[in-house]
Every structure is written in C-alpha cells, then in structure tokens.
C-alpha cells in the first residue's frame, strides 16, 4: 500500500513513517522542512510543502491509496487554523485523486464523554486550565477539523489519543469508539493505531479513542512536550 503522511516530521509522524516502512508500505512524507527529515528509505518519497498550500497537498496525495494526518502545532494565544485549513486541502486533494481512506489525529479533549480519571487537582485545576486557557485556540481548531472531516463523504476515522508520552515499542494498547477509560497514550501506540486504520475499514466514519493502559508519565512533562515546546 502507498500512504501519504501529513505532519510526517513531527514526533508522531516520524514514528508512523517508520512503522509503515518497516511493513514494506510505500510512504510519501509531507513536511515543511524536508532538510530536517531524518528518515531515509528506498520506499520513502519526501514531499516538501505547507499543508495550507492546496496544490502541494494535492500533488503529495495523487497516486496514493490512503492518507494519514499527524498534523500538530504547539499551544498559542493567537488563533490556530492549521488543522482545519490543512484538512480542507487534504479532502480536496483526495477528491481530485479519487482516494477515500483518511485517518487523522485529534485529541481526547474532543470526546463528548469525559470520564473522571485524574483526581481533584487534574480534573478541577490542570485540565480546565490546559483546555480553556493554554490550549484553547488549538482545541478550537481541532473541533473545526473534526466537523469538516465528519461532514465529508470520505471513509474517515478520527483518532483521539489521551496525554502523549514516549515509549520504546508498541504495546497492547486499547481502542474504543468515542472514549476509553485511560489518561495516557504512548506515541508509538498512536502511530501504530493510525497505520492500522489505513489497513482496515473496521472504524470507518467513527471517532475512536486510543490509550495505553497502566501508563503513568508526568503530566507536567506532557503539557510541556505536547503544547509548549516548539514542534520539529
């Protein structure tokens, strides 16, 4: 299978690219900074461009079998539109190329079924601050992205991880429709889940939660890594 990966130079995108190549898939890795992309492989094609450039996006999609979006941006005080603008161009490119399968990363924050998982400090102080203050503009745009994707005629899947952390290998992670009772997701599990969506139609036209049971990373480290530090 040939896959186009958007956000390929991010931490999740790199893992996704590596996993796909390890399974002998062909990958088109779309990135704004091709000079900084660290992966080389005979089955890899690097496509330079910005996801807000419709022509570049369409060119990267043409001739592939499925599209995976691992787009991500740090928290910002200013309005964010990368997710929504990007997915509009991705969907247009898929329509032009006659491609139907799309899986994209969102966040467990988007779930309409919140669960009490973190205790008083997490639920009453940390999470509300991150969602409504620190990450408000990012999550606002994720909501727009989800609405655009779910309103399309594509065979889409929205993948919602919980707090992301690093792990050395894919685990026996959990997947469920809409929500799952765990607070954290190993990034490599998220990448593997995205790849599985491209290879299956089990969760088509669904939002799924993916999480790593038993994980207990530092919440403050996660907030810094996912929302504050500059993305690669």
Feature roles, as predicted:
Residues 4, 28, 157:
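Conserved beta-strand positions in the Rossmann-like core of class I SAM-dependent methyltransferases
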């Amino acid at each position: 299978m040939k896959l186009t990966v958007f956000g390929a130079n991010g931490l999740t995108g790199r893992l996704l690219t590596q996993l796909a190549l390890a399974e002998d898939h062909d990958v088109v890795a779309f990135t704004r900074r091709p000079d900084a992309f660290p992966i080389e492989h005979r089955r890899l094609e690097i496509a330079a461009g910005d996801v807000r450039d419709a022509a570049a996006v369409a060119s990267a999609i043409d001739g592939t079998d499925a599209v995976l979006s691992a787009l991500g941006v740090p928290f910002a005080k200013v309005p964010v539109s990368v997710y929504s603008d990007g997915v509009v161009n991705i969907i247009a490119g898929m329509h032009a190329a006659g491609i139907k399968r799309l899986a994209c990363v969102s966040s467990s924050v988007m779930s309409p079924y919140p669960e009490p998982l973190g205790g008083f400090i997490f639920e009453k102080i940390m999470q509300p601050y991150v969602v409504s203050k620190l990450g408000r503009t990012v999550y606002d745009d994720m909501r727009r992205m989800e609405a655009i994707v779910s309103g399309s005629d594509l065979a889409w899947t929205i993948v919602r991880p919980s707090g992301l952390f690093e792990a050395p290998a894919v685990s026996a992670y959990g997947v469920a429709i809409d929500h799952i009772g765990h607070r954290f997701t190993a990034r490599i599990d998220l990448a593997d889940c995205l790849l599985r969506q491209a290879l299956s139609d089990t969760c088509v036209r669904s939002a799924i939660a993916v999480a790593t049971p038993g994980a207990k990373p530092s919440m403050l480290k996660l907030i810094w890594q996912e929302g504050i530090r500059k993305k690669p």
